[in-house]
């Protein structure tokens, strides 16, 4: 983009933004407090798993179900081999959100210098589980676990770089700050009338 990005009227828009939160996670917004209320009300808990059966269940019934419900035919997913390779390599972890004995959601934690939420999903992409606080739990429980492990920051992963993007807006309720962006993007050149 260097040839295109040359003037004061040129604007670079990255495809993806990365955001982080400070740990311990503090619920200061009305939305975050409501998420925590739902988690407590429904007595959601979490567990970490490396069990192959749990990985397959998460991949098929949470991750794929969620992205296919959200993106339908345009969904592009990682293969199970790629997914399980990332989870089983290094110290990466699958965190499952549970209601009783049922895993209702999950998120993969990439255990880097600043641990990162990689992919998440809700069982059967269920709105019932969403209303129970499953989405908030995929942020709250990793933050709780990482705080207990001594981490001071957690990456919330990538979001589209448009401020009206729903995922980016959701992350704002947890007081995130933008910590980086993709090198891939587009350049907008502002033209003048001739």
Name each region found by the language model.
Residues 1-41, 159-194:
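Terminal substrate-recognition subdomain of acyl/acetyltransferases
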